[in-house]
Design a protein with these regions (language model features):
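Structured beta->alpha junctions
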Residues: 11-14, 124-126
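Phosphate-binding glycine-rich loops and adjacent basic patches that engage nucleotide phosphates
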Residues: 1, 33-44, 70-73, 98-102, ...
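Contiguous beta-strand/loop segments that form the cofactor/metal-binding neighborhood of enzyme cores
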Residues: 69, 75-156
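A short helix->loop->beta-strand "cap" motif at the edges of active sites that frequently abuts
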Residues: 2-6, 115-117
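C-terminal glycine/acidic-rich active-site capping loop/insertion
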Residues: 112, 134-137, 141-191
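Active-site rim elements
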Residues: 63-65, 95, 124, 182-187
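Generic beta-structure capping elements
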Residues: 40-42, 58, 91, 123, ...
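Predominantly a Rossmann-like dinucleotide-binding segment in NAD(P)-dependent oxidoreductases
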Residues: 5-6, 13-100
Length: 191
């Protein structure tokens, strides 16, 4: 502020059509009391990926590891949907890579302001031939939704609305996640 310079993060997943439906379901109370939420990013990055740029895997230039770089968009989406957490307990480790300063694996347990319990798992040490999608799960007393990237594997509520079947058809989840195993597969809309 003093220098007259603004800084903002870009979190485009907040604005996807699928997210709009999920946010509306959360905000309108369709889940009832939400009990459990989860953000899971189980991706793979090769050692060559980290070696291809001097900034990758460093505290000074990358700002963090698997959570700050690869998982940040999914974590932001979870907070966008659920609000802030009152309590967080976490741990991190370097499990599959060498010559990097930051974590490649982390897990956290949290309690959100509304009382829901949550889990975040973020890693670039989970090998997969095709990659695992980034996942958001929200489960409550009246509904459950499992979001894979920007598609839904599960969209279920105790009371069906007139748009539920259309949402399931339009946003049906398919194959592996873009960028999960190949960072060049993330298109401009994911950044």
């Amino acid at each position: 502020d003093d220098a007259g310079v603004g800084l903002a993060g870009i979190f485009p997943r907040r604005f996807s059509p699928a997210t709009a439906h999920l946010k509306a379901a959360v905000d309108s109370g369709r889940f009832g009391r939400i009990s459990l939420v989860e953000a899971t990013i189980k991706w793979w990055r090769t050692q060559a990926y980290y070696g291809s740029g001097a900034w990758r895997g460093t505290w000074d230039l990358d700002g963090g590891g698997a959570l700050m770089n690869q998982s940040i968009h999914t974590i932001d989406l979870l907070v966008h949907l659920m609000g802030d957490a009152d309590h967080v307990q976490a741990d991190a480790a370097l499990r599959a890579h060498s010559d990097i300063e930051v974590e490649d694996t982390a897990a956290a347990i949290m309690r959100f302001q509304g009382g829901a319990l949550g889990v975040v798992q973020g890693s670039t040490a989970c090998w997969s031939a095709g990659g695992h999608p980034a996942e958001i799960h929200i489960c409550g007393e009246h509904g459950s939704v499992f979001m894979s990237d920007d598609k839904f594997r599960v969209w279920e509520f105790a009371e069906e609305s007139s748009t539920d079947q259309d949402i399931r058809l339009e946003f049906a989840a398919g194959g592996a996640g873009a960028g999960a195993a190949d960072p060049s597969a993330i298109d401009f809309s994911g950044h």
